[in-house]
């Protein structure tokens, strides 16, 4: 039987003018995903993927670098303007939005989509340091 050759689908260059930047900012990390208006991911970056480890992942600087990296990759696909949706209570929320603007993307709208429980699960206990 003949060997089956691996045919990998090459990543094609999408030409997307507008998109949505999803910023997920937790207490431990910040993840920035830039999608087209339908929700298909174009680029993403996170503080951990950029090499920040431990408590450095949760800093605003790490969030800024993650947003910058994701935005530059999206701009290679022709992105010019974005809507930003922010989720989570982390430290990198504002820093990520500011760095998206600084890279050269036009921010049309910022919305907070942090899930708020209607008295759902019990929250974690308070830290005593």
From Swiss-Prot:
It holds the Pfam family Ribosomal_S11. InterPro entries: Ribosomal_uS11 (IPR001971), Ribosomal_uS11_bac-type (IPR019981), Ribosomal_uS11_CS (IPR018102), Ribosomal_uS11_sf (IPR036967). SUPFAM superfamilies: Translational machinery components. Part of the 30S ribosomal subunit. Interacts with proteins S7 and S18. Binds to IF-3. Coiled coil: none annotated. This is Small ribosomal subunit protein uS11. The keyword Ribonucleoprotein applies. GO terms for molecular function: rRNA binding; structural constituent of ribosome. Located on the platform of the 30S subunit, it bridges several disparate RNA helices of the 16S rRNA. Forms part of the Shine-Dalgarno cleft in the 70S ribosome. It comes from the Bacteria. Belongs to the universal ribosomal protein uS11 family.
